[in-house]
A protein has these predicted regions:
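Extended active-site neighborhood of metal-dependent phosphoesterases/phosphodiesterases
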Residues: 1-98, 118-119, 123, 127-139, ...
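Short, well-ordered beta-to-alpha junction loops that form the rim of enzyme active sites
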Residues: 16, 61, 105-109, 144-145, ...
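Short acidic, glycine-rich surface-loop motifs adjacent to enzyme active sites
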Residues: 97-114
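Residue-level signal for glycine
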Residues: 206-208
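Short, solvent-exposed beta-strand-to-loop segments that form ligand-recognition rims
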Residues: 210-214
Length: 216
């Protein structure tokens, strides 16, 4: 965390592990660290460079999933969140988004190969995916599963991406819709111009092992 290359702005989102504790403390850390920039449980940021603009919509997925809402002893804050309010906010932000590219980032996957409860993804498919499809977002990127995955599904032009973890990684196998998967630990970076948006998956040695490409 103190490496010179990490002295940049961080834009966090909440995941299931944060919901096991005090989620407000994660937001409040914004007041402690200059790098930590988390204005709310969900928020949006626009980055523009050399005439190309990307909108990132950072969302809070645990409250969208019944499993977390119903297990109030383990995830005490999840059931306190207004799910409909967040979904309406996502819809409103995407309605007015005019940037070249739009990327939505949440902790939980909509589509992915995983041994985790199917109900997690079915809730995401029921509640979030229709909004993303309606507004034709470019990429939905998530974590939670600790490996790299890229999927496309019939009826949707969205690239569904799972980003790996910087620590524990897990095995993965292809399923219907899988274009790429890898158990490597690592991270991803975005590059873009007016005609192409790339999400580069990078392993622990710094090698690009796969790139999600979108073109116009």
């Amino acid at each position: 965390y103190s490496h010179p290359e990490l002295m940049i702005d961080w834009f966090p989102i909440l995941g299931n592990h944060e919901y096991r504790g005090n989620t407000q403390a994660v937001l409040d850390y914004t007041n402690v660290s200059r790098r930590w920039s988390m204005p709310g449980r969900y928020y949006t940021k626009v980055f523009e460079k050399k005439g190309t603009a990307i909108r990132f919509v950072m969302i809070d997925t645990a409250p969208l999933i019944d499993k977390y809402r119903n297990e109030s002893e383990t995830y005490p804050d999840a059931c306190k969140q207004d799910m409909d309010q967040q979904l309406a906010w996502i819809d409103s932000v995407l309605t007015v988004a005019k940037e070249d590219w739009v990327v939505v980032i949440g902790h939980h996957p909509i589509y992915a190969e995983t041994s985790k409860d199917d109900s997690e993804r079915s809730d995401m498919q029921k509640r979030l995916d229709p909004i993303l499809r309606k507004h034709k977002v470019d990429i939905y990127a998530c974590g939670h599963i600790h490996n790299f995955q890229h999927l496309r599904v019939p009826g949707s032009d969205i690239d569904y991406v799972v980003n790996s973890a910087g620590s524990l990684s897990r095995k993965v196998k292809p399923v219907e819709g899988t274009l790429f998967c890898s158990p490597e630990p690592g991270f991803s970076i975005f590059t873009a111009d007016k005609k192409e948006l790339d999400m580069h998956m990078i392993d622990k040695k710094g090698k690009v092992i796969y790139t999600v490409k979108r073109t116009k």
